[in-house]
């Protein structure tokens, strides 16, 4: 059954006015995001509460998606409704801010599981955070890049930190994924619309599987 969900550095800047108009025009094309797939809700809901509470998921909005057309906040809300109460959404962030948040979480509980989910250009903030954490021997458990082209040049020019256990690269069907990310797997979503990827049913399905894996 499908469920409707609520809807620096190469370096990041706010989009010019024409880009904002383009985002508005593409809102309809992005469509209505639904959650579906083969992982039953019971796979999440039967996990012990303490296992889900140990997982902290930070969803980071694209700096270009100022209108939140990608609906990543709705994805975070969906996972909170499924018991992953420590799912947070950042409208804006930075590498140092994310690194500081990871350190704070580790300080509170060194057994916590941390996932960073970056929509499009937010991948550069995750890269920056990992680089900073790597300098002090710190790491995260999972990173997810959602259809990011921004990260491709960064990785081609500077490589990618490896201080994480697993990377999931979720890309639309006509967009080649970034290459050179260690410990990574590629997941495709059957859309050619960049703005639809973050809340696409296949994306949410993959995130469900990854969070269950992380909590177990």
Which ranges hold each PLM region?
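Bacterial N-terminal signal peptides that target proteins for export
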Residues: 3-21
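Bacterial N-terminal signal peptides
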Residues: 19-29
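Active-site catalytic motif of lipid deacylating hydrolases and related acyltransferases
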Residues: 35-112
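Lipolytic serine-hydrolase domain surface
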Residues: 64, 73, 155-216
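Solvent-exposed, acidic/flexible segments
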Residues: 64-72, 91, 95, 119-126, ...
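Serine-dependent carboxylesterase/thioesterase catalytic core
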Residues: 79, 86, 99-181
């Amino acid at each position: 059954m499908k469920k409707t969900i609520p809807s620096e550095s190469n370096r990041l800047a706010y989009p010019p006015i024409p880009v904002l108009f383009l985002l508005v025009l593409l809102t309809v094309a992005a469509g209505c995001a639904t959650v579906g797939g083969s992982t039953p809700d019971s796979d999440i809901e039967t996990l012990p509460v303490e296992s889900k509470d140990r997982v902290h998921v930070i969803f980071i909005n694209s700096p270009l998606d100022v209108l939140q057309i990608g609906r990543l906040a709705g994805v975070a809300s969906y996972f909170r409704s499924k018991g992953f109460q420590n799912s947070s959404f950042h409208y804006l962030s930075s590498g140092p801010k994310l690194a500081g948040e990871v350190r704070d979480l580790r300080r509170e509980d060194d057994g916590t599981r941390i996932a960073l989910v970056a929509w499009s250009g937010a991948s550069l903030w995750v890269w920056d955070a990992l680089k900073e954490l790597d300098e002090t021997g710190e790491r995260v458990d999972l990173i997810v890049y959602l259809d990011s082209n921004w990260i491709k040049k960064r990785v081609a020019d500077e490589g990618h930190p490896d201080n994480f256990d697993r990377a999931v690269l979720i890309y639309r069907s006509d967009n080649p994924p970034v290459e050179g990310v260690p410990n990574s797997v590629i997941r495709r979503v059957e859309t050619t619309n960049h703005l639809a990827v973050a809340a696409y049913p296949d994306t949410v399905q993959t995130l469900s599987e990854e969070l269950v894996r992380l909590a177990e």
